[in-house]
Amino acid sequence: MSVLIRPLAIGDVTAAVNVIIGGSTKPEAEQPDETALYWAAAEETRNRRGEVLVAELDDEVVGICQVLIFQHFQHTGGWCCEIESVHVRADKRSQGIGAALLESAEALAIERGCYRVQLTSNSVRRDAHRFYSAHGYTASHQGFKKFFTS
């Protein structure tokens, strides 16, 4: 098995969104037919020095993560990386694909001069927490979110 980690292409959007739906705690929030909106988010991420990465296996998109790069107001305005939307298709988990995505995201953060990488994971995703811990992440902070209704 050889997984390829590469930037998202416009033709990957629907498959990538379906990977997210398969692992999401709120799949109803996703609309895979809204390709233009997802592509705009990917372009905005790139415009801000980040990237949306996909994992490709046997010509199929089986994983995704979004790498956000921003200048932090702490650490003398140092660059920071936030990894979001890490998902691997359920039938492809525990095969090193998530690790390859994480490694590529971290390499991009280092290349862009980031002093730190951070991520959040839903509190109910215990397997994901074990995965991140096994890859050197520590549960050092507690995160909070507030959703707005439209």
Predicted regions and their residues:
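A short beta-loop-alpha structural element at the N-terminal edge
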Residues: 4-18, 29
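Conserved beta-strand-loop-alpha-helix junction that forms the acyl-donor binding cleft
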Residues: 118-128, 145-147
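A conserved beta-turn-beta hairpin within the catalytic core of GNAT-like acetyltransferases
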Residues: 72-83, 93, 140
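Conserved beta-strand in the GNAT
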Residues: 54, 60-69, 87
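Glycine-rich phosphate/pyrophosphate-binding loop shared by adenosine-nucleotide-utilizing enzymes
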Residues: 3, 60-64, 81
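Conserved acetyl-CoA-binding loop-helix of GNAT-fold acetyltransferases
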Residues: 85-88, 94-107, 134
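A short helix-loop-beta-strand connector motif used in the catalytic cores of GNAT acetyltransferases and
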Residues: 43-54, 82
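Conserved GNAT acetyl-CoA-binding A-motif
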Residues: 102, 109-121
